[in-house]
Amino acid sequence: MGKQCFVTGRKASTGNHRSHALNANKRRWNANLQKVRILVDGKPKKVWVSARALKSGKVTRV
C-alpha cells in the first residue's frame, strides 16, 4: 500500500513550481503523515495516519 492516510485517504498532491520567468516544473505537496500503531480489527498495526486525523481524535494510538 502506498503512503496514504489510513483513515482519511489523504495523500500527496501534485502541481507546478513556477519560477519568475513562469517556467513550470512538476512538484509535490506531501500530506503530514505519521507512522503510528493503532488497533485494526482488534489487533495493533502500524499504519500511516495524517496529523489532522490524529489531532481531531479520529484514531487513538496503542
Curated annotation (Swiss-Prot):
Keyword terms, alphabetized: Ribonucleoprotein, Ribosomal protein
SUPFAM superfamilies according to UniProt: L28p-like
Gene Ontology CC annotations of this record: ribonucleoprotein complex; ribosome
Single GO MF annotation: structural constituent of ribosome
GO terms, biological process: translation
Coiled-coil stretches noted in the UniProt entry, renumbered to this chain: none
Pfam families noted in UniProt: Ribosomal_L28 (PF00830)
PANTHER family: 50S RIBOSOMAL PROTEIN L28 (PTHR39080), LARGE RIBOSOMAL SUBUNIT PROTEIN BL28A (PTHR39080:SF1)
Family: Belongs to the bacterial ribosomal protein bL28 family.
Name the record gives this protein: Large ribosomal subunit protein bL28
Organism: Staphylococcus epidermidis (strain ATCC 35984 / DSM 28319 / BCRC 17069 / CCUG 31568 / BM 3577 / RP62A)
Gene: rpmB
